Regions:
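Active-site-adjacent loops and short helices of periplasmic peptidoglycan-processing enzymes
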Residues: 21-182, 186, 195
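A generic alpha-helix preference that emphasizes hydrophobic side chains
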Residues: 10-11, 121, 181, 276
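Secretory targeting and sorting signals
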Residues: 1-29
Length: 295
């Protein structure tokens, strides 16, 4: 937790700093790092971000990448990764009122209806359904057990500055939980190593059963249609977290992951999607042998 405490201090004292051409440094020394002599990283609405190689785990650049922020719905990537290790895709669960009567975004999960793990994964990742996330957590063992397993999974993959408070990213007992851009990228990297997760997060839509019939769930990751080579991602927003995003793209056989946290879009300024595209473009232009840290 020493790095987490240092990141809190850095985020308080150096929140407005800009990226400079410096070599890698501990988070407590400088929250913004990129290789010496590399091009300046474009500005955007997210003050806390990371760009890394999805395959090697090498970090190309970051700003406040060890600073903790509430994850909002990006924590659903950790839920999905945990569920994929715990249950089969055709495992079923009956939705409960407690799981479905939640603050929305909602996918339309109905109490008393039976759903498969695959249907709930689609609804959790594509449209960020909090009802689907809670029901998927029930399939894993229930709210508390699922959250414990999510935190154990995070620790196992090296995301040691992450604490999930709920399956959905909404506040749980004690608050909203936290993660860092570094950990969020590491979690997404681990999830993308699972072919089922990679297929789900890349699909533009998926069918979902409702009382009115099957309806399509449309992927909320706009980078899939805005950025050539985008291969998946997860959005998030709460008042505490502001806008969050984690995603990946491929170009010429090279895959990058980005994570962006605690941003607000200002009228007339670049959008989150603009910043995501700029970070990816910057990363693809860099020498893959140069890095500042590892995931």
């Amino acid at each position: 937790m020493g790095r987490l405490a240092a990141a809190f201090a850095a985020s308080i004292t150096l929140f407005g700093s800009t990226v400079t051409g410096v070599a890698a440094a501990p988070a407590s020394a400088d929250p913004s790092v990129q290789p010496v002599g590399s091009m300046p990283v474009p500005e955007g609405p997210a003050p806390s971000w990371i760009v890394a190689d999805l395959d090697t785990g090498q970090v190309l650049a970051g700003r406040d990448m060890y600073s903790p922020h509430p994850p909002a719905s990006t924590i659903k990537t950790l839920l999905a990764l945990t569920a994929l290790d715990e249950v089969s895709l055709d495992a079923t669960v009956v939705a409960t009122p407690a799981a479905t009567q939640v603050e929305c975004n909602c996918a339309g999960v109905t109490a008393g209806h039976t759903y498969t793990a695959r249907q709930l994964l689609d609804a959790t990742l594509l449209v960020s359904g909090n009802d689907a996330a809670n029901t998927l957590a029930d399939l894993v063992g229930g709210f508390d057990i699922a959250v414990d397993k999510m935190n154990a999974k995070a620790a196992a993959i090296g995301a040691t500055d992450t604490h999930a408070a709920s399956p959905s990213g909404l506040d749980g007992p004690g608050g909203p939980g936290w993660t860092t851009p570094h950990d969020l990228a590491a979690i997404f990297r681990a999830a993308m190593a699972n072919p089922v997760f990679a297929q789900i997060t890349a699909q533009p839509s998926a069918p979902f059963p409702t009382d009115a019939g099957v309806r399509p769930l449309l992927n909320q990751d706009e980078l899939l249609v805005r950025y050539p080579g985008a291969i998946g991602g997860k959005t998030g927003y709460t008042n505490a977290a502001r806008k969050t995003f984690v995603g990946a793209a491929e170009r010429n056989g090279r895959r990058l992951v980005i994570a962006m946290m605690y941003g607000l879009v200002h009228e007339g300024g670049p959008t989150y999607w603009d910043q995501a595209a700029m970070l990816l473009d910057w990363g693809f232009a860099q020498n893959p042998a140069q890095g500042v840290a590892t995931l």
